[in-house]
């Protein structure tokens, strides 16, 4: 892979964030909170003016930039007991992993869902905390592919695109114990 800096690039985006507790349903549910954060990002790099450019795409997205990001979550904290729990979902859109050149097209990373769960309990007059986390519950493979349409449709198309790397992902279990003195 070769990297060349471009003199022309453009990026613009919008973000929406929502946070709402469920107290409107009943008083007992006011400690349950829904959170959402969504972003749309449009990025373009123009390589037409780069000398000795061998890229297969002259106008492409910025390397590593997803066109969207979605974060969703449900959080619960019991104020008297010090018990907390959360489930979080994250997804980023497909993104350019490595730029290509003529004869060796760019690699894109296909989006994959991430789902995390966490439960915690305070103790010892709220000075201690034990937390158990399971990260990447879905553990879907990460797929890197070369786009068959060369710049037209960058979304992964299983029937057309060439998978160059399929990487397994695993659940991660964490138990944390902390104290504040």
Protein language model regions, located:
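Active-site lining segments that contact anionic ligands and/or coordinate catalytic metals
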Residues: 69, 82-84, 112-116, 127-129, ...
């Amino acid at each position: 892979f070769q990297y060349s800096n471009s003199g022309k690039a453009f990026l613009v985006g919008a973000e929406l964030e929502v946070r709402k507790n469920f107290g409107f349903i009943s008083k007992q549910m006011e400690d349950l909170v829904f959170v959402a954060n969504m972003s749309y990002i449009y990025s373009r790099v123009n390589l037409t003016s780069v000398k000795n450019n061998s890229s297969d795409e002259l106008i492409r997205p910025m390397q590593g930039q997803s066109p969207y990001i979605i974060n969703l979550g449900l959080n619960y904290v019991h104020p008297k007991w010090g018990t907390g729990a959360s489930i979080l979902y994250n997804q980023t859109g497909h993104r350019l992993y490595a730029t290509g050149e003529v004869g060796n097209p760019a690699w894109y990373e296909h989006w994959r869902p991430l789902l995390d769960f966490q439960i915690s309990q305070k103790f010892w007059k709220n000075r201690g905390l034990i937390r158990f986390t399971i990260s990447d519950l879905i553990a879907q493979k990460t797929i890197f592919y070369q786009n068959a349409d060369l710049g037209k449709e960058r979304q992964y198309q299983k029937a057309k695109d060439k998978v160059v790397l399929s990487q397994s992902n695993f659940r991660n279990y964490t138990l944390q114990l902390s104290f504040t003195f």
